[in-house]
Amino acid sequence: MELSFTTSIAVATIVFVLFKLATRPKSNKKLLPEPWRLPIIGHMHHLIGTMPHRGVMDLARKYGSLMHLQLGEVSTIVVSSPKWAKEILTTHDITFANRPETLTGEIIAYHNTDIVLAPYGEYWRQLRKLCTLELLSVKKVKSFQSLREEECWNLVQEVKESGSGRPVDLSENIFKMIATILSRAAFGKGIKDQKEFTEIVKEILRQTGGFDVADIFPSKKFLHHLSGKRARLTSIHKKLDNLINNIVAEHPGNNSSKSNETLLDVMLRLKDSVEFPLTADNVKAIILDMFGAGTDTSSATVEWAISELIRCPRAMEKVQAELRQALKGKDKVKEEDIQDLSYLDLVIKETLRLHPPLPLVMPRECRQPVNLAGYDIANKTKLIVNVFAINRDPEYWKDAESFIPERFENSPITVMGAEYEYLPFGAGRRMCPGAALGLANVQLPLANILYHFNWKLPNGASHDQLDMTESFGATVQRKTHLVLVPSF
């Protein structure tokens, strides 16, 4: 039987491909382990239908704690163990100090000029210095104590006014409270467009996270338009830019001491510094970091802490007893009242272990070719450190999936990235610079919510019926809002 034209072409193509495979030069390079891949999309099919941090963790358990993934056009190495995290984030930290370019960073973050996405170099080093010495110093974080206490008290009053025994949407209330705290820290009391600003930030966070088609096929610019991503981000950015311009224009400035400066005051004071001048867009990009990233991560952590405590009545009873014994019936909670509460600290540490704010941290990018344990890593290879997997590594953590705050008792482990089995804020040069501010915005709100109220699920549901399903975005949030019934 004669072969059809189509069959002939197919046979010829197969023969040609096999010939090319057989005759291509043999490489002596040692290749990282990886799953089987498909043409064009690489390994993306392994992650379809999963939470990215969980899907990548499952692959690592099969292919190793240092593995390769081809995500579309982007060659990526994934680190899922303390051993490899320490190797890369210490020995090779500067080699992997860059950030990969993203469409979101280009449009929303004013061409990647914020602290989070700025490429490694002199500009980033100066931004880091600005954060360390001015914006996010211990002294500056402390200066916002009174507004944290005031906004926490406002939340307590709102819950009390709603009435004992009536369900409260804690997700919405916590997000609003922390957004207000950060808004006041950034801009001062009472910006006119705060609600609109908060909604825009929420939309940005919804557009961020996961593996976006525009970022895994960066050379295919038509996909940016075909997916609608560029148009959506451009529209969001236009609204955002107008709002921040209005906020800056209406900002009264600071005529008193540095101790009363808002974050915007600090940047406007330093904007025309001879040593390190900032453009108007630089200021806006940094402000967006302070407000956007801080609101999402802190509110998510408070929500997850309460969720875990609801599911673990023993721990809930213990932390509430500690708070109520220490405060002895006081009306308002002050930060100095809770600084030495050990079990509250354990609860926060354990929450950050199980629910790190950024489970895949922020991806890095290789700045030059490097050899890792005999594996050749090419320039511009993307690095993902799966903190979610590291924090649940059964080799380092007994009953790793269980919420057990006591595991941190008498432990030297801190949240600051010195121990590589526990990296809630990352480690190395690109570690989250806002860890101190983030912790302050978790500790006091959580203490107030637990001290003033007892909580239960609505409709008589038992504690183990609480839905803990995740939703992936810029951070990992609860998929459903945390709605609980207070009593007081």
Curated annotation (Swiss-Prot):
It is a single-pass type II membrane protein. Keywords: Endoplasmic reticulum, Glycoprotein, Heme, Iron, Membrane, Metal-binding, Monooxygenase, Oxidoreductase, Signal-anchor, Transmembrane, Transmembrane helix. Heme binds at residue 432. The chain crosses the membrane at residues 7-23. Its cofactor is heme. The keyword Isomerase does not apply. One of its GO terms (molecular function) is iron ion binding. It holds the Pfam family p450. Pathway: Secondary metabolite biosynthesis; terpenoid biosynthesis. SUPFAM superfamilies: Cytochrome P450. InterPro entries: Cyt_P450, Cyt_P450_CS, Cyt_P450_E_grp-I, Cyt_P450_sf. Involved in the biosynthesis of germacrene-derived sesquiterpene lactones. Catalyzes three consecutive oxidations of germacrene A to produce germacrene A acid. Could also catalyze the three-step oxidation of non-natural substrate amorphadiene to artemisinic acid. Belongs to the cytochrome P450 family. This is Germacrene A hydroxylase. The gene is GAO.
